[in-house]
Amino acid sequence: MQLTKWGKNKMPNWTFNTLKVVAYSDDEGAIKQFDEFVKLSIVPAKVYDEEGKVKGESKEDKAFTFEGVHPMPKDLMITSGTRTPEEEKQAQENLKKYGHKDWYDWSIAEWGTKWNASNFCILEEILDDKYSKELTVSFDTAWCPPMEWLQKATEKFPLIRFEMEVSEESDAFMGKPIAQYGKVCENITDINYPS
């Protein structure tokens, strides 16, 4: 799915995502990968002060993050658009080192969406029975589902199964991408309404 199809410089329409992660109990390697995925992806939520700056982490609340599977390099945390001479120098160094000048270009190329997951909710706590371990979460993304992130997740954790359900807020597309063994079946349908 190409982000530019919906216009990368406009305010985003939101995509609603539900992700189910499954490891079957008879596969010890899959169970280890599942536990590692959960450890990296479900993290303490950040706590912000009145000015919107991070002041710490919550002891109770959790967040789902793309950073656990595919972290953004800290050097990329500069703005696109107008830059100081120092930021422009950093942008050129970033381009050489990472292939992207800033967080915006990197996150679109590497995660498939402008920002990290937002409005996270655990829909089903880790279900651990004699057949499988499962975790189901919902989250929102800007413009598109995080297909590039999903590809990286299945490459890093090939033995676990990722099942997503996605829909765009104006119903421009929907689908049920599935990933396992390093491959993603997108299964996204564009719905073209007459203008």
Regions found by a protein language model. Name each.
Residues 6, 10-195:
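Long, contiguous binding/interaction regions
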